[in-house]
From Swiss-Prot:
One of its GO terms (biological process) is translation. Keywords: Ribonucleoprotein, Ribosomal protein. This is Large ribosomal subunit protein bL35. Belongs to the bacterial ribosomal protein bL35 family. It holds the Pfam family Ribosomal_L35p. It comes from the Bacteria. InterPro entries: Ribosomal_bL35, Ribosomal_bL35-like, Ribosomal_bL35_CS, Ribosomal_bL35_sf.
Length: 65
């Protein structure tokens, strides 16, 4: 029986060719007025998840994305 991939994980994460997990930077939904411009600028783009977080995400995408 094939395992299903979690749809929410498909939308939020990507895998690199080497198997690292990439996601968008967190903390940019609201409340940007309080933050410095450099902080907002640094939160653009994507980030590579750490080892423990990537292990959890990979459980939900058994065959990759």
């Amino acid at each position: 029986m094939k395992l299903k991939t979690k749809s929410s994980v498909k939308k939020r994460f990507n895998l690199t060719a080497k198997g690292k997990v990439i996601s968008a930077q967190s903390g940019k939904r609201h409340g940007m007025v309080k933050r410095s411009k450099s902080n907002i600028r640094n939160q653009r783009g994507t980030t590579v998840l750490g080892k423990s977080d990537s292990r959890i995400v990979k459980l939900y995408i058994p065959y990759g994305i």
